[in-house]
UniProtKB/Swiss-Prot annotation:
The active site is at 67 (proton acceptor). This is Cis-3-hydroxy-L-proline dehydratase. Transmembrane segments: none annotated. Its cofactor is Fe(3+). Catalyzes the dehydration of cis-3-hydroxy-L-proline (c3LHyp) to Delta(1)-pyrroline-2-carboxylate (Pyr2C). No activity with L-proline, trans-4-hydroxy-L-proline (t4LHyp), cis-4-hydroxy-L-proline (c4LHyp), trans-3-hydroxy-L-proline (t3LHyp), D-proline, cis-4-hydroxy-D-proline (c4DHyp), trans-4-hydroxy-D-proline (t4DHyp) or L-serine as substrates. Because of the low catalytic efficiency, C3LHyp is likely not a main physiological substrate of this enzyme in H.jecorina. The keyword Ion transport does not apply. Keywords: Iron, Lyase.
Length: 596
C-alpha cells in the first residue's frame, strides 16, 4: 500500500502540470504498432496494457521500444486531444519525448515528461491517481482532490537552447534564422534533444534516412508541410523510408482516396524538401549505404540496428521528425552511439553449439526476438552464431526482430559483426557484463507467441518483405515456387524497394513470381498495409517476419502464423500451415514435454 500523497522527485524533460488516473506497466511499449493513433487504445496484443485507452490518463512505462514512429503516433494523439496527460519513465526516453517536443515547438501543445529513479518508478506502479508538476510526481488517493504538487524537483533539466552546448558559427546561423524558419525550428528541436541527451556539441552528418514520411494521420502531414512551406531544404543526402501506399498503384489496389492522397501529399512534402524517393525500410540495401565508422542519422528501427550492428556506421535511434530536422541542418547531437565508447556490450548471450545443417532461416528472427526481449535497453553481444555463417539477410531478419523487442539500437555477434572480431572487442573496457547461457528450447516460447492463430486454421495470405526483401530473397522465393502450384484461395504478397524491383525485373524474377501468383508491391511495407490490399476475406496471415508477426495482430485484427520462407511457400501451396516447431527447437525438448 502506498502512503497517502507520496511525493517522488525526478527530472522534468518537458515541464508542465497534469493530474489524472495512472495507467502503468513495467514493460516498455512501442507506440507505433502498439497504440492506435486515432483512438489512443493500446493495440499491442502481447502487452499487459492491451485494450487500455491512454486518453486523459497519466502513462507510466519504463521507456518506449521498437519503432521510431512512436513520436508520430504521440503527435497525432496530442494534436487531436486524445493523448495522455503526462508521461512518466524510469530512464531517458527519446522517441516519445521528441513527439512532445515537436508538439510544443511547432504547434504549441505539450504535456509533462518526467523521468523517475527506478525504485521510485517501481513503487509508483501501485498508484491509481497521480499528479505531476515539473519534476515532481505525487500519488493522489481516490476521493482526494486532484491537484498538482509544488515542483521541488532536485534535478531540473537545463534545456536552455545552446547555453550548455558548444555551438559552431553554422549552428548559431541556423538558430538565428539566417537559413530560414524551417532550419531555425529544426535547430531548436535538435538542441533541446541534445540537452536531454547530455551532448556537449553537435557533429556533421553524412546522410539521413527519414522515417517520418510514414503517414500516421493529419498531424504527420501538417508537420512536414509546415517545414516545407517555411522553406525547408535538406543539406545532406537524404533517403525516404517506406510510405503508406504503393505510390504508383494505390488507386488500382482500391485504397481509399482519403488515405492514398494524404500519403502522397506527405511523400511529396519530403521530396519537395530534397529527399530522394527511395521509399524503403531497408536503406542498407541501397548503393548509398554508409561505410564503417560513418556518422549518419537514420530513423526506422530495423535500419538503425542494421546500420550500427552490421555496417558499423554510427547513428542513434532517431525518432521520426528529428530525422528531417537533422537533414535540414546537417547537424546532430554528439552522443549515444556516435561515441565509440558507448557502443560496447553490457550483456553477453552465449548459444549452445549448433551446426548450420541444424537450422532454417526462421532461427534468426526467433533468436533476435528473444535476445531483444532479454536485452531491453542493453547492447548485447551474442556468442556462438559465427559457426552458422549467417548471411546479410539472416542478420536483417535477426535485427528487425531484435529492434521490435529492444530499445537498444545495436547488437554484436562475435566473429560476424564488424566491431566484434572477438568477445573482448565487443565488451571493450566495460566491467560487470552480465552473461546468459541461452538454451535453444527457450525459443519455443517465442514460436508460440508469434504463432497466434489456432492450429490448422486455413491460411489466407502469405505476407513477405518486412523488412523489404533483397534481390537474393526474391531469387530464393522464385526458386522455392518454381514448378509448384499456388492454392487458389491463398494470396501471396511481397514488398520490396523500387530499386530492388527493377533489378528483379531485369533478371526475369518478377515475371516468374507473377506466374506463380505472387503480387510484388513497392514503396510501402507491411506495418502500413491494411484493407483492401489485405483482402477483407483474409482472416489468417502467415509471414516469415517476427516483426510483423508481433505487430500484425494489433495492426490488422488478423490471426498470424510465423515460419521459415520455405514453410511459407508450402502453406501457399497447401492452403494451411502445420504449426509443428522447427527441428532445431523440438529436437532439444525432452520427450514427453509436449510440443506445439
Amino acid at each position: 500500500m502506498l502512503p497517502r500523497n507520496s511525493h517522488y522527485k525526478g527530472t522534468a524533460y518537458v515541464h508542465g502540470k497534469a493530474s489524472g488516473p495512472l495507467i502503468a506497466s513495467n514493460l516498455e511499449l512501442s507506440f507505433w504498432g502498439g497504440v492506435d493513433p486515432q483512438t489512443s487504445q493500446v493495440i499491442d496484443h502481447h502487452h499487459p496494457l492491451s485494450g487500455e485507452f491512454l486518453q486523459d490518463a497519466i502513462l507510466a512505462i519504463p521507456s518506449g521500444r521498437g519503432s521510431c514512429s512512436g513520436s508520430g503516433v504521440l503527435l497525432e494523439l496530442l494534436l487531436s486531444g486524445k493523448g495522455p496527460k503526462a508521461l512518466i519513465f524510469s530512464r531517458r526516453e527519446d522517441i516519445l519525448t521528441l513527439g512532445v517536443v515537436v508538439a510544443e515547438e511547432i504547434f504549441g501543445r505539450s504535456i509533462p515528461v518526467v523521468v523517475l529513479a527506478v525504485t521510485d518508478f517501481e513503487e509508483l506502479l501501485a498508484a491509481r491517481y497521480v499528479a505531476v508538476n515539473g519534476g515532481t510526481v505525487s500519488t493522489v488517493q481516490l476521493g482526494d482532490a486532484m491537484h498538482s504538487p509544488e515542483d521541488d524537483s532536485t534535478e531540473p533539466l537545463d534545456t536552455t537552447l545552446g547555453l550548455s552546448i558548444e555551438l559552431s558559427n553554422k549552428d548559431y546561423a541556423f538558430l538565428s534564422g539566417a537559413h530560414g524558419q524551417a532550419a531555425q525550428a529544426a535547430m531548436r528541436i535538435i538542441l533541446r534533444m541534445a540537452a536531454m541527451e547530455g551532448a556537449r556539441k553537435l557533429i556533421d552528418i553524412t546522410q539521413v534516412h527519414i522515417d517520418g514520411c510514414v503517414y500516421t494521420g493529419p498531424a504527420s502531414l501538417k508537420f512536414a508541410e509546415t517545414l516545407r512551406d517555411w522553406g525547408g531544404k535538406v543539406v545532406t543526402p537524404t533517403t525516404l523510408n517506406s510510405i503508406f501506399v504503393d505510390q504508383r498503384r494505390w488507386r488500382a489496389q482500391g485504397v481509399p482516396s482519403v488515405f492514398g492522397e494524404a500519403a502522397e501529399k506527405l511523400a511529396t512534402a519530403y521530396t519537395d524538401m530534397g529527399a530522394l524517393p527511395t521509399y524503403t525500410c531497408a536503406p542498407y540495401l541501397l548503393p548509398s549505404a554508409p561505410k564503417r565508422g560513418e556518422q549518419v542519422a537514420w530513423a526506422e528501427s530495423n535500419a538503425v540496428v542494421y546500420a550500427n550492428s552490421v555496417l558499423g556506421a554510427k547513428t542513434m535511434k532517431y525518432p521520426d521528425f528529428l530525422d528531417i530536422c537533422i537533414a535540414l541542418t546537417g547537424r546532430a547531437p554528439y552522443g549515444g552511439l556516435h561515441i565509440e565508447s558507448n557502443r560496447s556490450a553490457s550483456l553477453c548471450v552465449e548459444l549452445p553449439v549448433l551446426q548450420k545443417a541444424d537450422i532454417d532461416d526462421s532461427f534468426y528472427p526467433l533468436l533476435g526476438y528473444h535476445v531483444g526481449r532479454i536485452a531491453g535497453s542493453r547492447i548485447p553481444v551474442v556468442v556462438g552464431v559465427d559457426v552458422l555463417r549467417p548471411s546479410r539477410d539472416d542478420l536483417k531478419a535477426f535485427g528487425a526482430a531484435f529492434a521490435t523487442m529492444a530499445s537498444a539500437p545495436m547488437f554484436h555477434i562475435v566473429g560476424v559483426t564488424p566491431e566484434a572480431a572477438t568477445l573482448q572487442d565487443a565488451i571493450g573496457r566495460r566491467e560487470g557484463v552480465e552473461c546468459i547461457r541461452l538454451d535453444v528450447t527457450e525459443l519455443q516460447t517465442v514460436w508460440r507467441t508469434l504463432n497466434s492463430a489456432e492450429d490448422n486454421s486455413p491460411v489466407d495470405l502469405i505476407s513477405l518483405g518486412n523488412p523489404h526483401f533483397s534481390i537474393a530473397e526474391l531469387r530464393r522465393l522464385a526458386s522455392l515456387c518454381r514448378g509448384r502450384a499456388k492454392h487458389d484461395k491463398v494470396a501471396v504478397m511481397v514488398t520490396c524497394a523500387r530499386a530492388t524491383y527493377g533489378l528483379a525485373d531485369q533478371a526475369g524474377l518478377i515475371e516468374e513470381l507473377h506466374r506463380f501468383g505472387v503480387e510484388v508491391i513497392t514503396d510501402t511495407c507491411w506495418c502500413m498495409i491494411g484493407e483492401p490490399v489485405i483482402p477483407t476475406t483474409s482472416r489468417t496471415i502467415m509471414t516469415n517476419s517476427a516483426k510483423y508477426a508481433h505487430y500484425g495482430p494489433g495492426l490488422t485484427g488478423r490471426r498470424f502464423y510465423f515460419g521459415s520462407l520455405a514453410r511459407c511457400v508450402d502453406a501457399a501451396c497447401d492452403g494451411y500451415f502445420d504449426t509443428k516447431m522447427p527441428g532445431f527447437i523440438s529436437s532439444c525438448i525432452p520427450k514427453g514435454a509436449g510440443v506445439r
